Amino acid sequence: MALSQSVPFLATELLLASAIFCLVFWVLRGSRPRVPKGLKSPPEPWGWPLLGHVLTLGKNPHLALSRMSQLYGDVLQIRIGSTPVLVLSGLDTIRQALVRQGDDFKGRPDLYSFTFITDGQSMSFSPDSGPVWAARRRLAQNALNTFSIASDPASSSSCYLEEHVSKEAEALISRLQELMAGPGHFDPYNQVVVSVANVIGAMCFGQHFPESSDEMLSLVKNSHEFVESASSGNPVDFFPILRYLPNPALQRFKAFNQRFRRFLQKTVQEHYQDFDKNSVQDITGALFKHSKKGPRASGNLIPQEKIVNLVNDIFGAGFDTIATAISWSLMYLVTKPEIQRKIQKELDAVIGRGRRPRLSDRPQLPYLEAFILETFRHSSFVPFTIPHSTTRDTTLNGFYIPRECCVFINQWQVNHDPQLWGDPSEFRPERFLTAEGTTINKPLSEKIMLFGLGKRRCIGEVLGKWEVFLFLAILLQQLEFSVPPGVKVDLTPIYGLTMKHARCEHFQARLRFSIK
């Protein structure tokens, strides 16, 4: 009797489970775009219903997707939740998409986390990719170049960047000497991040930048609260229910963006109080001046309230990536002291000890330049670009890609592709030198992916490369970096928009000589 009662109950359960399975199957099938005749969809590995491939991505999506690309090719599709995501690997494929078909792939997906960056109006993160966006991007690029890498007629330095970096590098050397005389050790990232923030702050705001204020120091030293949630594949962007559950990382991200925006708004407003259009001294002043002219219809005129959004993007372009690059460089140098000695030998031979390095010395310091390139490649600390999206239906490598498809660009895979590098796991700066060892192999150096490509390429790329070079040249000319014997330096990247290394508080710096 009991058995006969349980049979209908079991049948009901099976029927319900079958109905749910069919519903999920048809929902997922219905969400797939219709592929035009003669084309095919990108290959897609098996994924869990409702979850997709989120479990496969794990804590290091760049590694998981690189392994997938070996099996499925340079163009593949995954699902995070029910959202299809196109994943591009391989340098040729990425160049085809972002450069040759740049208009098709220049969009940004409308992701939940992006709405908290400058209230959803960030030039870098917002979905906008129309004429107004393009005009403001050009304006931001021109303002950044004018007050960073363009010549400075009022200074003995070759440009504003050289003037500010030289000043901050010397201040950093003095600060490190004080730390060595006191505690006897330091955390390199904590020190470098302040110096880099002061450089971009001076270029953005001139004398109005609150250098070393408690508020500024708190923001720059906690920038990890931004990068951990702005990374590609953040589950909160694909599973709406996570927005309503306890999420400490998301709360930190929201709070950081609010604090950073208030900080910039306050600094921009104070700057505007004594703005003189006949004496523009910094990036924000250039934006103020531009907001007073230009036909509105063309998108060249910036409303005053939008200036802080551009400043936010420019500050970001000239801050986190550069600080992370310098910090990674120092980590490699203490683990490979023979490379540090070769760089210092080159600096001594080319520059000597009577003056500081300048940007004009860059062509004569190929080994230092090769070391920087290898740091960019080996660390690949920007594993993905900010996600792209397609602006219209298109094809790539024979695959049909629908409009508004989210696209991940795997820069890490390009920088560790054995077909490009032969021995990608080895840290070998010499790979970027010509056979004579006197110049950089330019075609090979252009295969590194760190700043993106095409219409969304980072506007701070040139600034970043120049600034990293000059900071390292000045620091390594005067200081020798090391860690005590027995101290292990962990070079395992921590995944994020920019990947940081584990903090090392045992750095030491010995003064080689000083320049008055």
UniProtKB/Swiss-Prot annotation:
Q: In which pathway does it act?
A: Cofactor metabolism; retinol metabolism; Steroid metabolism; cholesterol metabolism; Lipid metabolism; arachidonate metabolism
Q: What keywords tag this UniProt record?
A: Endoplasmic reticulum, Fatty acid metabolism, Glycoprotein, Heme, Iron, Lipid metabolism, Lyase, Membrane, Metal-binding, Microsome, Monooxygenase, Oxidoreductase, Steroid metabolism, Sterol metabolism
GO biological process annotation, one example: estrogen metabolic process
Q: Which domain of life is it from?
A: Eukaryota
**Does the keyword section mention Iron?**
yes
Q: Which family does the entry's similarity section mention?
A: Belongs to the cytochrome P450 family.
Question: InterPro entries this protein is in?
Answer: Cyt_P450 (IPR001128), Cyt_P450_CS (IPR017972), Cyt_P450_E_grp-I (IPR002401), Cyt_P450_E_grp-I_CYP1 (IPR008066), Cyt_P450_sf (IPR036396)
**Catalytic activities:** an organic molecule + reduced [NADPH--hemoprotein reductase] + O2 = an alcohol + oxidized [NADPH--hemoprotein reductase] + H2O + H(+); 17beta-estradiol + reduced [NADPH--hemoprotein reductase] + O2 = 2-hydroxy-17beta-estradiol + oxidized [NADPH--hemoprotein reductase] + H2O + H(+); 17beta-estradiol + reduced [NADPH--hemoprotein reductase] + O2 = 4-hydroxy-17beta-estradiol + oxidized [NADPH--hemoprotein reductase] + H2O + H(+); estrone + reduced [NADPH--hemoprotein reductase] + O2 = 2-hydroxyestrone + oxidized [NADPH--hemoprotein reductase] + H2O + H(+)
Instruction: Report the protein's function.
Output: A cytochrome P450 monooxygenase involved in the metabolism of various endogenous substrates, including fatty acids, steroid hormones and vitamins. Mechanistically, uses molecular oxygen inserting one oxygen atom into a substrate, and reducing the second into a water molecule, with two electrons provided by NADPH via cytochrome P450 reductase (NADPH--hemoprotein reductase). Catalyzes the hydroxylation of carbon-hydrogen bonds. Exhibits high catalytic activity for the formation of hydroxyestrogens from estrone (E1) and 17beta-estradiol (E2), namely 2-hydroxy E1 and E2.
Q: Which residues bind substrate?
A: 226
| Keyword Glycoprotein attached | yes
Q: What is its EC number?
A: 1.14.14.1, 4.2.1.152
Describe, from its UniProt entry, the tissues in which this protein is expressed. Answer: Liver.
Quaternary structure per UniProt? Answer: Interacts with PGRMC1; the interaction requires PGRMC1 homodimerization.
The stated induction of this gene product is: By 3-methylcholanthrene (3MC).
Q: Where is carbohydrate linked to this protein?
A: 69
Task: Name the GO cellular-component terms.
Answer: endoplasmic reticulum membrane
The positions annotated for binding heme are 458
The places in or outside the cell where this protein is found are: Endoplasmic reticulum membrane; Microsome membrane
**Listed name of the protein:** Cytochrome P450 1A2
